[in-house]
């Protein structure tokens, strides 16, 4: 099985190293094509106004000056054009990709691009808690990742579907199983603007997020990782809401 690995945290990110280890537990044909720099939050964007710079940094390892979607396209359409991958793995992201994170995430986008190109694709993320990004428990993803991926492949991934996997903020031995979960919803009032001034007195701004204080819904990815369970969420490329499609169609016919 040929596996193509990418991420959005960049070619030197510890989560990418973790995912390479996971991939090598599944196959001896692992290729890495990842962004040259951190691309967190770029979602499914493409580099349309800048050239893509490709640099080989090791055996089967490439860095692209571009987004995660660019990396998958370069991997499939250029680097591996004569023998395309059987599986795309994107991650392991530094922090969970649950609820609305899915719409912003470059990690999810890497798997999404693979799905668009007709390749089975899985996004993986490692949650962190009060200890912050400096204290991520990468061993959780590293230990449980191969088994979870094998199970997903055994179940099968239908065309047009990608799978979003989130590992909880705990040690491997403290994981309380796997939960197949729906995408949750946060209180987006948590999103704030942090206004500052530079040394010349000019204003600049950072996006900031207040600490979440809400009860996650049952059966959601948010609830799963809060309970130290691995969340597995199938996502559809087709974003059409079928009930609303019917309702709108009826209204426009009236």
UniProtKB/Swiss-Prot annotation:
Q: Does the keyword Cytoplasm apply?
A: yes
Catalyzed reactions: a ribonucleoside 5'-phosphate + H2O = a ribonucleoside + phosphate
UniProt-recorded name of the protein: 5'-nucleotidase SurE
Per the UniProt record, which EC number(s) apply here? 3.1.3.5
Q: Which HAMAP family match?
A: SurE
Source organism of the structure: Methylorubrum extorquens (strain PA1) (Methylobacterium extorquens)
Instruction: Report the cofactor remark.
Output: Binds 1 divalent metal cation per subunit.
Annotated PANTHER family = 5'-NUCLEOTIDASE SURE, 5'_3'-NUCLEOTIDASE SURE
